[in-house]
């Protein structure tokens, strides 16, 4: 009962801190440390400068505060371990210092402090003997190098950068420096869940765990897809630790969330060839060797934003000759059309009927004119020109002429196919 009470109280405090983190003062920083269970004490460095020291099992943060002006002038982080190259910078910028000097409240500093305390709590280090089974501070600092080598070896044209926007995190950027994905750490629901140290080997091109003793518990690596619109992925392509509980049952909310291709373009016959449903997915728990799924997830993200999503938008476009609000075109095969007989009821026109046509000054067609004249209605002709488009979670085909595949084709082929389809429909 006491444990449940303490846990509930901790959640309430976290909600209040997130809602209103408070302005950046020495007193508010001290209170924040108290709510997080961190030790803190203040020393008077000089007449105008106070130093707040924040300490836990491994981390020690010294914050120098100018009392007269009421602002932070310096922040330093020291680790009580044998690793002294922990990355808390973005280039030359100290993100702990920036989170206390660039913003109007403690929100960013609180976010960074939670990250540090998580690594502190979950690192498997014996401080007295200075023996480390799994130092998460060292692993976080080495992971960007592992990830860059992994992406380069798989041909992903992405650049790895750390601690952007004054927040801890490992970011993946494309050629235009747009943030595509982010790696960070988070606590697991099961505090006994093991997380092993996996390093990337450029020789074997694999993620390997070099020691069965190199593990910790209660933490996991989290891979987050960034950007808009959201990415939809096939259910069977997600890692087992995907945190979205909506995938466990076919609930009503799940049915509403899955993506459905719709066709309103009268020039297209859509053949929905999906074998699984696709759902919005952005966050993935990459426990242990599942870190090797990063490239597959990134390729799925690229496939969605390059092929499937643009095609879904093209199908919603009704064409230049269709008014907004027209009913969507039926996704059915066009009917077969026969040349209509010029005879009525298979009988010959009588002389009287011929005379009547002449008397009414109506043009009498010759046999040659009848044979050369198109007798297929304009609407039917348009249906004969419909494009048959097959869409699947792994491929897209335009009739039997051309297509592109998630597994077999390069990204350039994806882009060329979508552009070809766009030109046909616009």
Curated annotation (Swiss-Prot):
The keyword Transcription regulation applies. One of its GO terms (molecular function) is transcription coregulator activity. Its main location: nucleus. InterPro entries: Mediator_Med1. GO terms for cellular component: core mediator complex; mediator complex. It holds the Pfam family Med1. Residues 336-347 have a biased composition (Basic residues). Component of the Mediator complex, a coactivator involved in the regulated transcription of nearly all RNA polymerase II-dependent genes. Mediator functions as a bridge to convey information from gene-specific regulatory proteins to the basal RNA polymerase II transcription machinery. Mediator is recruited to promoters by direct interactions with regulatory proteins and serves as a scaffold for the assembly of a functional preinitiation complex with RNA polymerase II and the general transcription factors. Belongs to the Mediator complex subunit 1 family. This is Mediator of RNA polymerase II transcription subunit 1. It comes from Eremothecium gossypii (strain ATCC 10895 / CBS 109.51 / FGSC 9923 / NRRL Y-1056) (Yeast).
């Amino acid at each position: 009962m006491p444990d449940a009470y303490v846990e509930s109280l901790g959640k309430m405090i976290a909600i209040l801190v997130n809602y209103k983190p408070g302005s950046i003062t020495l007193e508010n920083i001290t209170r924040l440390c108290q709510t997080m269970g961190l030790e803190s004490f203040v020393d008077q460095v000089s007449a105008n400068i106070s130093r707040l020291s924040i300490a836990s099992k491994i981390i020690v943060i010294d914050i120098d505060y100018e009392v007269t002006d009421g602002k932070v002038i310096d922040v330093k982080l020291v680790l009580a371990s044998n690793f002294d190259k922990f990355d808390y910078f973005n280039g030359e910028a100290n993100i702990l210092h920036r989170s206390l000097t660039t913003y109007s409240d403690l929100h960013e500093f609180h976010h960074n402090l939670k990250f540090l305390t998580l690594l502190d709590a979950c690192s498997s280090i014996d401080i007295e003997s200075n023996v480390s089974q799994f130092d998460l501070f060292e692993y976080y600092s080495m992971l960007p190098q592992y990830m860059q080598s992994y992406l380069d070896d798989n041909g992903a044209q992405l650049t790895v950068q750390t601690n952007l926007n004054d927040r801890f995190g490992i970011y993946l950027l494309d050629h235009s420096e747009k943030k595509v994905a982010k790696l960070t750490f988070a606590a697991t629901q099961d505090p006994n869940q093991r997380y092993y140290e996996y390093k990337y080997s450029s020789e074997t091109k694999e993620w390997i765990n070099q020691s069965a003793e190199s593990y910790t518990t209660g933490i996991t690596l989290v891979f987050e897809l960034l950007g808009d619109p959201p990415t939809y992925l096939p259910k069977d392509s997600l890692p087992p630790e995907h945190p979205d509980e909506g995938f466990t049952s076919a609930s009503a909310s799940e049915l509403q969330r899955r993506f459905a291709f719709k066709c309103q373009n009268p020039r297209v016959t859509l053949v929905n060839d999906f074998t699984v449903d696709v759902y919005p997915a952005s966050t993935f728990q990459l426990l242990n060797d599942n870190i090797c799924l990063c490239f597959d997830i990134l390729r799925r993200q690229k496939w969605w934003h390059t092929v499937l999503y643009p095609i879904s938008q093209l199908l919603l476009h009704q064409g230049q000759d269709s008014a907004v609000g027209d009913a969507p075109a039926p996704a059915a095969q066009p009917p077969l059309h026969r040349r209509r007989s010029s005879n009525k009821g298979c009988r010959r026109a009588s002389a009287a009927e011929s005379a009547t046509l002449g008397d009414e000054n109506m043009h009498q067609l010759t046999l040659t004119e009848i044979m050369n004249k198109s007798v297929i209605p304009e609407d039917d002709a348009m249906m004969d020109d419909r494009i048959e488009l097959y869409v699947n979670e792994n491929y897209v085909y335009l009739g039997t002429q051309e297509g592109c595949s998630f597994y077999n084709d390069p990204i350039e082929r994806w882009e060329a196919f979508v552009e070809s389809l766009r030109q046909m429909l616009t």
